[in-house]
Regions:
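Bacterial N-terminal signal peptides
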Residues: 21-33
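Immediate N-terminus of the mature polypeptide
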Residues: 2-14, 20, 35-442, 446-498, ...
């Protein structure tokens, strides 16, 4: 009931004179202001549970500095550095050694290790310089993803110029899960791919943590602990989890002119199917009148034992026209898709961390939708999409913020039978063919500003080698593209969208009212959106390009994991001629979950 009241409130906002629609204008240019042939899957996809990734905790440095005066000379001329695996391997009075010797010790990148320690040979060694040598060795190991190493200089006679150093690298001992309540310990420890008594590779372990933390119902971090045996290190997977079921309901005004702006939604997320951490998600979406749009969508995410991820997702949508002359005209579409994702090795340079993955898959889309293009419904239009997809994802984090990159390459061989042919595609968009290639790139940079302000820059670029069917075109207008315009007011084959957004520091309203248990956050937003698109091959009467631009303000408000509200109000700076010419509008989304 609360959702309905909130929806009514949202409609009241839109009924303000600043947001009141004017005369309805339907564009007749094919592909530029068309009703999308299939409801965008992202619009009706199940709402995600926000994940909280954790980083591995660095091992405590157990190596101790040499005490005493750092200027005290220990040896006038260092002739040899001998590295041994245990204190028991130190040889009293060792004299027959020269240069750098590794006795039963294996280091990562031996040539680089020699380059780190060999400059000390032939030098006068003080206590201070010896401490620098020890820290340089520890840093070398960490730079090579070996975080657990003890570098010990035992008591010895070094007047002969030979210095023996114990290099004790931690090996894998026990792997245990602690703190987990709803997920089994075996499920968590199986997500860490290490060999008993094997080396501890921090980069590989961070990849394992990322794999475990794909499940949004748990957060796992790694703590290194001394093992039972000398040289062993236990891996403690400290986990904070919650009951792996979330149900939610909400409202958005993300609909279109033909089927109504109101969208009511309800769904669930389940995060431990078969006790394997598999995720099952479902959402039902309907229009305000309950008949203009009815959509089912779902996804299944299966983390595989070898660290890859298999995902299936799909949707089924029924539509019915909401405005003259489209009243009663029905359409139907569905989609079945799959993706196989492979994480790539991450790398860490200084304080910059970069993580990436690649994925491949296939999309099948069926679209039978007579609510097409222009002022009058076309004859029944029917087309099938059969396309291969290659995806690249990258995330870079640094002290100043985060950069994300997502690239999707879509390839359709064409003429795969049924309604996957040039005749069907040309019927929904003049010049479109069933064989095509197009690429979509999305890049975003979040930069931390002074006083906890932040700046977000986001860009989307799409390019194609031919005219595309409506379901594959780049859409302009709506809360996640160019705000202030109707949802997918403009659709084109090629184009770009750019967003600049400034966000204030978050405010805890509950804290201000002395209700810290509320755990809420309020944030204000100011933004400028710009988009420009065109079709690959222009039809007679089509404009060369259609730019859109808007400025506005908004807010984001959350209460723990139970309530999420977004609200934006934007003013158009450029008119497309395709909308109802209201010049501005709001975009609102509300989700209640438990």
């Amino acid at each position: 009931m609360a959702i309905i009241d909130l929806a009514a409130f949202a409609r009241t906002i839109r009924s303000h004179p600043l947001a009141r629609p004017g005369t309805v204008v339907l564009a007749g240019w094919l592909g530029l202001a068309s009703l999308r042939g299939a409801e965008d899957f992202n619009r009706i996809a199940p709402k995600a549970v926000p994940a909280q990734p954790a980083d591995a905790t660095a091992a405590p440095n157990q190596s101790q500095k040499e005490s005493g005066d750092p200027r005290q000379v220990l040896v006038e001329n260092l002739k040899a550095l001998v590295f041994v695996p245990t204190p028991g391997a130190v040889s009293p009075g060792l004299v027959h050694a020269h240069g750098v010797e590794l006795r039963n010790v294996v280091t990562p990148a031996p040539d680089e290790f020699h380059a780190v320690v060999s400059p000390y040979l032939g030098e006068t060694v003080t206590r201070g310089k010896l401490n620098v040598l020890v820290q340089s060795i520890i840093l070398f190991y960490r730079q090579h993803n070996r975080p657990v190493v003890d570098v010990v200089v035992p008591a010895q006679d070094i007047t002969n110029g030979v210095l023996q150093i114990v290099l004790l690298e931690g090996r894998v001992g026990k792997v245990v899960a602690t703190g987990n309540r709803w997920f089994s310990s075996e499920e968590i420890t199986d997500g860490v791919f290490v060999q008993p008594n094997g080396p501890i590779d921090s980069r590989a372990l961070q990849g394992d943590l990322d794999f475990l933390n794909q499940n949004p119902f748990r957060t796992t971090q790694l703590i290194y602990r001394p093992g039972e045996k000398l040289g062993q290190t236990d891996l403690d997977l400290q986990t904070h989890d919650r009951f792996p079921l979330r149900v939610y309901a909400g409202y958005e005004d993300s609909g279109d002119l033909e089927t109504g702006e109101d969208r009511y939604l309800t769904g669930f997320n389940y995060g431990d199917l078969f006790g394997l951490g598999h995720q099952l998600n479902y959402q039902y979406t309907t229009s305000g009148n309950g008949t203009s749009l009815r959509a089912h969508s779902g996804s299944y995410v299966a983390p595989l034992p070898w660290g890859h991820t298999l995902t299936f997702f799909g949707s089924y949508v029924d539509t019915k026209g909401n405005i003259p002359p489209l009243i009663g005209i029905r359409g139907r579409s569905y989609q079945i898709s799959g993706r196989y994702s492979v994480p790539l090795p991450s790398f860490n340079v200084a304080s910059v961390v970069y993580k990436e993955s690649i994925a491949g898959g296939f999309d099948y889309k069926y679209n039978k939708d007579s609510l097409e293009f222009g002022n009058a419904p076309a004859a029944n239009t029917l087309y099938d999409v059969d396309q291969f997809v290659l995806t690249y994802n990258g995330v870079e984090t640094d002290p100043y913020g985060r950069t994300t990159l997502n690239e999707n390459l879509y390839v359709s061989p064409g003429d795969w039978g049924g309604n996957n042919n040039d005749l069907a595609f040309n019927g929904v968009h003049g010049g479109a063919t069933s064989g095509y290639v197009y690429n979509t790139l999305v890049a975003e940079r979040l930069t931390k500003l002074p006083a906890d302000w932040s700046l977000i820059l986001r860009g989307t670029v799409q390019s194609s080698n031919s005219n595309l069917a409506p379901s594959e075109q780049l859409g302009f207008g709506g809360y996640d593209t160019v705000r202030g315009y109707d949802e997918r007011e403009v659709n084109t084959d090629d184009g770009f969208i750019f967003t600049t957004e400034v966000r204030t520091p978050t405010i805890g309203v509950g804290d201000l009212m002395h209700y810290p248990w509320l755990k809420d956050q309020l944030q204000f937003v100011g933004f400028w959106d710009y988009g420009d698109g065109s079709n690959h091959i222009l039809l007679p009467g089509e404009p060369q390009e259609i730019p859109l631009s808007s400025v506005g303000v908004g807010l984001r408000y959350t209460i723990n994991t139970y309530l999420s509200i977004r609200y934006d109000y934007a003013f158009q700076l450029l008119r497309t001629g395709f909308d109802n010419d209201h010049g501005s509008r709001s975009d609102i989304g509300i989700v209640l979950s438990y």
